[in-house]
Amino acid sequence: MSEALKDNPEQEMICVDAFGGRTGRIIDRKTAHSTPGIKHLAIQVMVFNPQKELILHERPLKKVGGGVWDSPTTHVLNGETPSQAGVRCLKDEYGIASNEEEITVLGGFSYEKDYGDGSCENEFCLAAFAVYTGSIKPNGEHVIKLMNFPAKKVRDEIKAGSSKYPVWFVETTRIVAADFNGKKFFE
């Protein structure tokens, strides 16, 4: 069993169907991420600066799906709205104090990934983005290294088949780049 499944076992996840519709069921994090998993709600917030750069972090290997470049990602917990979850996640992972109005939540996507160690992903993930100009104080529990990457370069690497980004990041990039307000960062 993956050690990552011991992280935040008390989290109460919102179960959803393949289209993000709530089923009314609440489940603990360990059960949600133990193979084959139970579909639950998540959100990823891409953070851009005004120079059209994505602020990304290297995800620790000890985390489920670790060892890749990623944006802040979390579960929408029981009693939270997606925007509230995004605010919580930005504070927890990057030390960014934001409010719900600063996060643009777009559509979502359903995906599954089995890591072969008893842990998996089985989520409907909402794509979101925010623009940030202040200082970032990364949380070492979530961040090995923090770097700014030109957003266009990241999208080009994804199109070329790069494996340094997780599947949920690839899908979030697709959704944000297709959005009227999000696409300007990738031009």
Where are the regions a protein language model picked out?
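Residue-level structural signal for beta-strand termini and adjacent loop
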Residues: 28-29, 60, 142
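Nudix hydrolase/Nudix homology domain
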Residues: 64-68, 78, 109-113, 119-187
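Acidic, metal-coordinating catalytic segment for phosphate/diphosphate chemistry
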Residues: 2-44, 48-50
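A glycine-rich, hydrophobic loop/mini-helix early in the fold
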Residues: 40-75
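Short hydrophobic alpha-helix segments
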Residues: 26-27, 58, 109
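A structural signal for short, well-ordered beta-strand segments
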Residues: 45, 72, 105, 126-130
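The catalytic Nudix box helix
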Residues: 56, 71-106
